[in-house]
Amino acid sequence: LDKKCNAICCQVHTLSGVLENLKTPPSLVITDSQAFKEVANIVPSTVRLTSFSVLMARYKGDMEMLLGGASAIDLLEDHDRILVAEACTHHRQCNDIGSVKIPTLLKKYTGKELEFSFSSGGEFPDDISDYKLIVHCGGCMINEASMKARMDKARESKVPMVNYGMLFAKINGILERISNIL
């Protein structure tokens, strides 16, 4: 609003029609990371695409570090330990993104037998050195200093970190596209 932008909200199933009805293409499409694959197939490659999670990484964290963490996904081996960290304390649902979807996607993508640990809210392990990767939520429920402290801890322990959005982009083959949002 401060930049005098016009925002249009729609569901994935109506996105094609919305784009067709615009006189000019949008400058940017922001989606939920879980819809990356479907949205990327609808939105022309000339239109910038990102997600709320990626924007949070840029706003509260170190986007370059998290992009590097996405590359670490390809280096995972059988029995590597992965920490899935969520900053909020929501009630987990049957098909929860952190405890169900991400482990399933990572196992399928890598073809490896991976071991997962989970943390939520203010809880973040003191010793993270045994993890080969940290997958962190976008951090919308914690402040910038808290998110950067977690990232600094990962950096000091030499443990790659990726956020949910970049993980979904990597797995769907659109990491480069979504990281070019400026």
Q: What are these regions, as identified by a protein language model?
A:
Residues 1-182:
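P-loop NTP-binding site
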